[in-house]
Amino acid sequence: NVRRAAQATADVLAADGATRVVVAHDTRFGGPMFAAAAAETLAANGLTVHLAEGPLPTPVLSFAVRHLGADAGVMLTASHNPPAWNGFKLKGAYGGTATEEVYRAVAARVAQVGPEQLRGDPDGEGRIEPLEAREAYFEALTRLLDLDLLRGLRGVLVHDAMGGAAAGWMAGF
């Protein structure tokens, strides 16, 4: 089903002239495997894919889409839903949730995609590159936050990723 959703996404994006997509996953079961399958399918359709090499918080995916000038983002996550669930979420070029029109087009296309239409291994048309967004994301946070004010606060500032994709992310900030 991930490959069908990725193929449908590639078909819809191709109709709009898209060339670049960011793909990431959270810490749920199968995340790396599902993200790799989506990336392979998208790349096999001629897209350049920036693939996260580990779990990524959804806001970082959204940032990366804008930062890289990508046409879309694919996040393998079920967000706030139970841990046993997973999902295929689309982001627009603006970094936010894809429009209802895009979701409807992808859903309609998924219903039409059969096994013979799935493209798997990249055939040289597209490529998969590692996503490198951490440094740029931290630079953006530095510009947006008043770090002097935060440093001057009394007490302790705590970040609890609760076992999610943000675990370990703030350690380098």
List where the protein language model places each region:
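Gly/Ser/Thr-rich loops at beta-strand to alpha-helix junctions
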Residues: D26-M33, L56, N81-P82, M162-A167
